[in-house]
Structure formats: C-alpha cells, structure tokens
C-alpha cells in the first residue's frame, strides 16, 4: 500500500535561519548538529527542543585563518519556535573547550531565499 503525501495545508510550516559561525577549531557539519542540539537542550530541555524540528540543511566552509575558522550554515526549524532557537543559539560560547560564536544573519521561508544571506 502506498502512503499518501500530506497536502500543503496540513504540513508544518518551516523557517530557515542563516547562521554565521566563527570557531577557533575545525568543525564539520556533524559537529554543528551536535553544537546546535546541545545548545537548545541546555536552554529548553529535551521536551522543548524536540518540538523545534531542527535540521542543518546546508553547511559552508568560508575561511580559515590563524585566529579562527569561519563557517556559514542554513538551519531549518518550525515557524512557531524561531525565537526560542535564536535565543538558544545566542547562548552557545564553547565547543570542546574552544571559543565559538554563532549568530543569526537572516531568516527566510525557503532555502533559496535564505541563500542570499550566505557569502560564497
């Protein structure tokens, strides 16, 4: 039996956050997933974070210098929890005992529109 696709009116509405990440060590997309999830869990707990529907859609490695590595990413979350996700991302400051800065540089309803905030 084939499952039916949900019509657009019944789907959950997503928003896409463009993130700017500066860290003193090298990170991968998997590391960023752990950083984001751990930051949200510390601030809102597992029950609250489970509702966010977080997903790292794209990950860009921009620049490596002696002082820091510069990355940008697109993060998906549910529309109702955008403010909570932004608040928990602002509180992230350490990863593996290295300084890290995560800031939101843009918010959009589609991935294509969110990519205009990303420097390539």
Swiss-Prot record:
Pfam families documented for this protein: RNase_P_Rpp14
Role noted for this protein: Part of ribonuclease P, a protein complex that generates mature tRNA molecules by cleaving their 5'-ends.
Top-level taxon of origin: Archaea
HAMAP family the UniProt entry points to: RNase_P_2
GO biological process terms held by the UniProt record: tRNA 5'-leader removal
Cellular localization per UniProt: Cytoplasm
Name of the protein: Ribonuclease P protein component 2
Gene Ontology CC entries for this record: cytoplasm; ribonuclease P complex
E.C. number: 3.1.26.5
Principal location class: cytoplasm
GO MF terms held by the record: ribonuclease P activity
